[in-house]
Amino acid sequence: MANHKSAEKRARQTIKRTERNRFYRTRLKNITKAVRVAVEAKDLNAANEALKVANKSIHSFVSRGFLKKQTAARRVSRLAQLVNTLKAA
């Protein structure tokens, strides 16, 4: 239990940030999984659509400060690589 007003505020902020980060983390996992599932099913159209959604979402996470720019670039690059394996096959 916080004894100071500022500590109470920090506790509230921590709860808010934790919930927000959990939401972003879950969303990131789900959009990544959608791309991987489409690739495993060998569905090029679905994989491209999922990649487009993933790209947009991941870069929006950067603008919100959830991910660093390079981390987002790496994740998008790896997903694009996965989708390109379908095009090559």
UniProtKB/Swiss-Prot annotation:
It holds the Pfam family Ribosomal_S20p. InterPro entries: Ribosomal_bS20, Ribosomal_bS20_sf. Keywords: Ribonucleoprotein, Ribosomal protein, RNA-binding, rRNA-binding. One of its GO terms (biological process) is translation. One of its GO terms (molecular function) is small ribosomal subunit rRNA binding. Residues 1-20 are annotated as: Disordered. SUPFAM superfamilies: Ribosomal protein S20. GO terms for cellular component: cytosol; small ribosomal subunit. Binds directly to 16S ribosomal RNA. Belongs to the bacterial ribosomal protein bS20 family. This is Small ribosomal subunit protein bS20.
